[in-house]
Amino acid sequence: MGWLGRLMLFPVLRWVVLGISFSSAVAADPIRKPVRSLLEIREDRVIVQKWETSCAAAALATVLTFSHNDPVTEKAVTMGMLRTTDPIKVKVRGGFSMLDMKHFVETRGLNGIGYKNLSFDDLLTLDAPIVPIDFQGNPHFVVVRGLKGDGEVHLADPAFGNHAISAEKFKSVWKDGMAFVVTE
């Protein structure tokens, strides 16, 4: 029996030899695939809000940047909306309104359309609607990405990033069938 045959009698050494041969073959032909963290996935194509009451600005920045190819920051939207509204009203309301968003997009040469009493099915026909929801008793704006095959509404949420909730849960927190849509 040669040295290789004797080596194969020892299980640990056999795996070391086989492991070296296998790893050499793998190293010769590496597989390259981009890896993203959970944070990157959660924040993909979402402008995350930096301030407690800036969800409207971040949601609008998300829609302008990713749906209308008009890159803008949350801060720029906030400052722009403050120029077209009464800051005291914003403070009393606890944030911006859909009318504030409308005035801002008009300064950028776009149109803003507000809806009320929409049905859920009608909402799903709109392109990147920003909707007000009730989040634990507080008003909050999110972007609806659509209803997926799993029966969940996928959201671009300025506070929590991309996530999904059941259609029933969404309907229970969606305020008055309201939506805001930016058009060309």
Spans of model-derived segments:
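Bacterial N-terminal signal peptides
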Residues: 10-24
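Active-site nucleophilic cysteine motif
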Residues: 50-65, 93-105
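N-terminal secretory signal peptides that target proteins for export/translocation
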Residues: 1-9
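Early exported N-terminus immediately downstream of N-terminal targeting peptides
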Residues: 57-88
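Conserved active-site-adjacent core of cysteine acyl-enzyme catalytic domains
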Residues: 29-40, 46, 79-183
